[in-house]
Amino acid sequence: MPLAEKLDRKLRPADDSSDGEDYYEVTDRSSSESILETANANKDDASDDERVKSQMSKVSFGALAKAQDALSKQQSADRKRKRGEDTSKSQDDKLEALRERLRQIKAEKMANGAAGAKPKKKSEGTKKGKVIQDEDDEDDDEEDVDSDNSDTEAAPKARSSKHAPMVQSSKRMVSRKRKVVDVKKPVFRDPRFDNMGGAAPDDNTLGNRYSFLNDYRASEIAELRRTIKKSKNEGEKERLKKQLLSMESQQKARENKEKHQEVIREHKKKEKELVKQGKQPFFLKKSEQKKLALIDRFQNMKSKQLDKVIERRRKKVTSKERRNMPERRTA
């Protein structure tokens, strides 16, 4: 018997009392029956628990895991459904309130238009201001509705065609670095290489002006040769030899260039004399200039030098032909 039923018993005073004091007796006579019923219920519960335990002991762990997964999925789906219902309800309430506000504004606008069908000229400005203000309020409300709709509909607007150009705003953000006053950028000029001081001198003029450099280079080459002979360190000697070879090759290249220029100058002198005689000027191509320089070089060579140059040239040509020769096909 539960505790509440035990406490919910009625008491009344006894009729026969010899000593004038009030005694009370319990009028609830169903206590013994309720106690028996609760004992039987406890026995049934214990037997049910034992039956459930015996059944659970026979269930496999795989079935229990599947049941647990199904319950967890169902609980998560219920939570999502409740959350979605709450958000949709709140959004519907907001939209409904905004629609109601728009209806009221339109009704007020219609009422103002009907009342002011025959207005005076003085009140036209004030009514126009009111109408503009109402329109602004309506636009604001429409913007709010559009913003809510944009929140609900997150999908972007699709283009009319996949070949159509992309839509881009023409509004550009102004940079913080602005030119208030245009200042000319300073231009640095070197008078040696600038045409403002006159035309640039040609190679002959430069060679005549800086001809003393050739004497300096010749003295450096002689000094290098003396240091190579005196030095005993092999590493230092190899480095000096490389430097000497580089300087000698540069000197030879300058001499060849000077000879080439000398041949061209001789040809120009001859052409000037022929032009004075009334003949048409003839300008050599670069290939013809190279041929004349090569002929002059071979004519000024000695026999031994000429043989060496011819042998070197022959080896170069044969190696080039050997490279271009096709390889032999093998099975």
UniProtKB/Swiss-Prot annotation:
A biological process term (GO) from this entry = maturation of SSU-rRNA from tricistronic rRNA transcript (SSU-rRNA, 5.8S rRNA, LSU-rRNA)
Its main subcellular localisation, reduced to a broad class, is: nucleus
Which keywords describe this protein according to UniProt? Coiled coil, Nucleus, Ribonucleoprotein, Ribosome biogenesis, rRNA processing
Q: Which InterPro entries match?
A: RRP36
Q: Where in the cell is it found?
A: Nucleus, Nucleolus
Instruction: Respond yes or no to whether keyword Endoplasmic reticulum is given for this record.
Output: no
Ranges annotated as biased composition (Acidic residues): 16-25, 134-151
Q: Where is the composition biased (Basic and acidic residues)?
A: 1-15, 42-53, 83-109, 122-133, 180-193, 251-272, 318-331
Q: Which Pfam families match?
A: RRP36
- Disordered: annotated span: 1-207, 247-272, 303-331
Q: Does the keyword Translocase apply?
A: no
Positions in coiled-coil regions: 82-112, 218-277
Q: Name one GO cellular component term.
A: 90S preribosome
Residue spans with biased composition (Polar residues)? 32-41
State how it assembles. Answer: Associates with 90S and pre-40S pre-ribosomal particles.
Family note: Belongs to the RRP36 family.
Function field: Component of the 90S pre-ribosome involved in the maturation of rRNAs. Required for early cleavages of the pre-RNAs in the 40S ribosomal subunit maturation pathway.
Q: Per its record, how is this protein called by name?
A: rRNA biogenesis protein RRP36
